[in-house]
Amino acid sequence: ELVILNKLKVNILGYLMNKTFLAIIPARGGSKRLPRKNILDLCGKPLISWSIEAALKSKYISKVVVSSDDEEILNISSNFGADIIKRPYELANDTATTFDAIKHTIDNFEKYDYIVLLQPTSPLRNEKHIDEAIELLEEKQADAIVSVCEMDHSPLWSNTLPKDGNMRGFLREEILNKRSQDLEKYYRLNGAVYICKTDKLLENKSFFLKDNIFAYIMDRKSSIDIDEEIDF
């Protein structure tokens, strides 16, 4: 059984080494909640550098590109070893989507088999996570992989509230006498790793394909997302 498992790993590794993966790190200069967050210091390094270094250490990533409208972000990213592309203003304003930035990057580089999106706000996602997600892609013969983590609290304990705060019907009857540990596990997107076949991504304009998409499960600690000053 161990021999079969090792052969499978070798086959996966061999297949993936023949595929090309373009890692894209989108980093706008403007951030409403936390200005300049992508280059704020985190343990002695700019926030974005954690994602750049993780991608560069990956066994499978062919090229790492930072897309930004901001010269300082681009200069810092280049110093940490990433290729850079200047994003035009219309693709970096509040109405522009992440896909707009991805499409702009794809159009300006040679063709790659897969796109790997790495948000710079996930500094604890490292090369091990990236490589495991890519290996899962081949293991599942998937078109797309998206990272998730287990939720801190079950959504079954939550609900909306009316203006007067009335809690009638707040919880479903079937969970009223259940312990938390007896409830099904729920998972949430953690924003750390998105992978998709390039053709499928361009066709669907999203990593969330209708079929043949699987979750890569990460631990909650590695899923930390930097969004506000308190997160630092």
Predicted stretch roles:
Residues 65, 71-116, 124-128, 132:
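Short phosphate-binding loop-to-helix
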Residues 20-67:
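N-terminal glycine-rich phosphate-binding loop and ensuing alpha1 helix
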Residues 205-216, 221-223:
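Catalytic donor-sugar/metal-binding loop of nucleotide-sugar-dependent glycosyltransferases
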Residues 122, 193, 215, 223-224:
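A residue-level structural signature of the nucleotidyltransferase/glycosyltransferase Rossmann-like core
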Residues 68-69, 125, 195-197, 218, ...:
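A conserved hydrophobic position in a structured secondary element of the catalytic/binding core
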Residues 1-16:
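N-terminal amphipathic/basic-hydrophobic helices that include classical n-h-c signal peptides
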Residues 95-100, 114, 123-211:
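Conserved core of the sugar-phosphate nucleotidyltransferase
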